Regions:
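Short beta->alpha transition motifs characteristic of CBS
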Residues: 67, 82-88, 92, 174-178, ...
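Second-shell loop/turn segments in exported
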Residues: 59-63, 88-96, 104-107, 126-134, ...
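Small/polar-residue-rich segments within soluble enzyme cores
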Residues: 91, 95, 102-110, 118-201, ...
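Short, basic/aromatic recognition patches
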Residues: 45, 53-64, 211-226
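Hydrophobic alpha-helical transmembrane signal-anchor segments
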Residues: 5-6, 20-55
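Conserved, well-ordered alpha-helix/loop/beta-strand core segments that scaffold catalytic motifs
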Residues: 129, 193-231
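Beta-lactam-recognizing serine transpeptidase/beta-lactamase-like catalytic domain environment
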Residues: 2-14, 81, 233, 238-285, ...
Length: 586
């Protein structure tokens, strides 16, 4: 049997299988530090996410809202609204290092809109971020720096700037301090101006800055002259519906809308109120042209030599219709319009009847707010019941109330060949076809141009004639109506014009709110003395701007109307008598 020798096992290398105490502790510390670093990174990341998404204690959404907001420009590219770099001042109360009482006093001096107690409370609070002044001026920023308080910060915040100041302020509207559009085209165009697809490109309005300035200047002069509480004016392209000017006085500066006193008197709204579309008025005798168009279109007027009895006031039930300046005679169609006879117009409306009168007004849109991009469009005052007297009185603008833009749209259709096109504040592409609704025939439209021209050459609008510009128009004066009650000493005066009448291109409407008579007007305050001069001034200034050069060799043909004009008949009779006497002497 063989013997087996068992060798002893080799000794274990302890240096390779055991960890020294020093190495073990270092490894443990490294792991702990790594975990702490990861945890801190996570906490910081979560905090940043919170600040970016949920926190509102720092600068608000103003900068985010503006971003690449596009400019608003006029039809010729003149900038009306733009975004510029602005700076707001703010403070972080927990970071204040100076004397808080002294700082509160200094802040109250520098920002006096709030009392010193307010700033004491802010500085003692735990609020992390408080605005001191939004859109601060350079002088205010410099003064804040001199306080030497590092807790006061300058926060970059782009702001909306209106380089033309108060011009077209009711059309443009304004933005609030947080960068949110409040009114006007700023509100209507908000999505387009800020969309990624628009990429900050400007949006062109139909407004012509030159025309707008002329309208505002003329209105301002007349408001001051006649101590009126306000005025409104519109210049409308009769073929495209583009509004070249829309003015409302008083005005406000879109750069500082907060400085506008809030109006409390319903008869005297504040400056942010757009009288051209928000106010609805009884527009008086300007409605006579509309009634005549209806009568011609429906065959009630076929013979312009037909005479109507205006020898005495017209009694209808308990109502008595009279003329302001009675002629006390039988009157032809041109005579009724030239002398603005309520009696003659009421008799024509009586032949039209209730149904056709109401239907024509509805066709013109007088029963609903006017169509336009702006909000706050006034609701017309429509008769609750159409009686015979309603038909007669609405024929000369009494008992129905519409906005100035309603009237401008209607007259555009009367003179442009009979088509009503929607009004717009956006520039249309040159030569673009603008669909519309036929209101009257081209033949009727021609007759309306003749009648409007006669009013200016022979009638109540005679002082509005400008050589070579061939203006036509109609005056209108009415008492203000508040809650169904007429304010006898408060007049609204209107002159609506179109030019040139041989080929109309523009309608101009001027409305004066409560003008007062003056020595120069012999105490009179009706449309011929108040609204008409402003419209005449506007047309004289904008005609050449718009390429309409005075030309006395052109005019609309009135030869078939003049024989029915009383003054022309008298002139012809006087001429014939002179010729007869000359022959007798011979």
């Amino acid at each position: 049997m063989n013997a087996v020798t068992v060798a002893p096992a080799p000794p274990r290398d302890r240096s390779r299988t055991q960890i020294s105490p020093g190495v073990s502790i270092a490894h443990y510390r490294l792991m702990v530090l790594t975990l702490l670093f990861a945890l801190m990174t996570g906490v910081i990341g979560l905090r940043l996410f919170y600040l970016a998404v949920f926190n509102t204690s720092g600068p608000g959404p103003a900068a985010a809202r503006y971003g690449p907001r596009g400019d608003i420009v006029d039809r010729n590219g003149i900038v009306l609204a733009s975004t510029i770099g602005g700076v707001s001042l703010a403070i972080r109360p927990p970071r204040v290092i100076g004397d808080r009482e002294r700082l509160a006093v200094e802040l109250a001096r520098l920002f006096p809109a709030r009392p010193v107690d307010y700033y004491r409370r802010v500085l003692q609070s735990r609020r992390k971020f408080v605005y001191l002044e939004r859109a601060a001026t350079p002088a205010k920023i410099h003064a804040a720096r001199l306080l030497g308080e590092p807790a006061i910060e300058e926060v970059p915040e782009p702001e909306r700037f209106y380089p033309q100041g108060s011009m077209a302020s009711q059309v443009l509207g304004y933005m609030d301090i947080g960068g949110v559009p409040v009114s006007g085209m700023e509100l209507y165009l908000d999505k387009q101006l800020t969309s990624a697809a628009n990429a900050g490109r400007p949006v062109a309005l139909s407004i012509d800055s030159r025309v707008q300035a002329a309208v505002e200047s003329a209105l301002k002069a007349q408001v001051i002259k006649h101590s009126a509480v306000g005025a409104a004016g519109i210049v409308l392209d009769v073929h495209t519906g583009e509004i070249l000017a829309m003015a409302s006085l008083p005005v406000f500066n879109s750069n500082a809308p907060g400085l506008v006193p809030v109006g409390t008197d319903p008869l005297r709204p504040d400056a942010r109120y757009n009288r051209a579309i928000s106010s609805v008025y009884e527009l008086g005798s300007t409605f006579k042209m509309i009634t005549f168009a209806n009568a011609i279109e429906n065959g009630v007027i076929t013979d312009f030599g037909k005479r109507y009895d205006a020898t005495a006031p017209l009694q209808v039930g308990r109502f008595r219709i009279k003329d302001d300046h009675p002629e006390n005679r039988w009157m032809t169609i041109p005579d009724i319009m030239i002398h603005s006879s309520n009696i003659g117009t009421a008799r024509i409306a009586d032949e039209l009847g209730e149904a056709r009168t109401a239907a024509f007004f509805r066709k013109l849109g007088f029963d609903k707010p006017v169509q336009l991009e702006l909000g706050a469009r006034g609701m017309p005052l429509w008769p609750g019941f159409w009686a015979r007297t309603t038909t007669m009185t609405t024929a000369y603008g009494h008992g129905i109330a519409v906005s100035q833009l309603h009237l401008a749209n209607a007259y555009a259709a009367l003179v442009n060949g009979g088509i009503q096109r929607p009004a717009t504040l956006l520039r249309r592409p040159a030569g673009a076809f603008v669909p519309g609704k036929r209101i009257i025939s081209e033949k009727t439209s021609f007759r309306m141009r003749q009648l409007m021209r006669l009013v200016v050459t022979h009638g109540t609008g005679k002082t509005g004639n400008l050589p070579g510009l061939r203006i036509g128009g109609k005056t209108g004066t009415a008492e203000k109506n508040l809650n169904g009650r007429y304010i006898h000493n408060s007049l609204v005066t209107t002159f609506v014009a179109a030019f040139p009448m041989d080929a109309p291109r523009y309608v101009v409407v001027v409305t004066m709110d409560e003008p007062q008579g003056i020595k120069e007007t012999y105490g009179f305050r009706t449309a011929a003395w108040t609204a008409l001069p402003a419209a005449k001034n506007i047309i004289a200034r904008i005609g050449p701007m718009l390429g309409i050069i005075p030309d006395t060799s052109k005019d609309i043909d009135l030869s078939d109307m003049l024989p029915y004009v009383y003054e022309e008949q008298l002139a012809q009779k006087e001429k014939a008598q002179k010729e007869t006497s000359i022959h007798a002497i011979d």
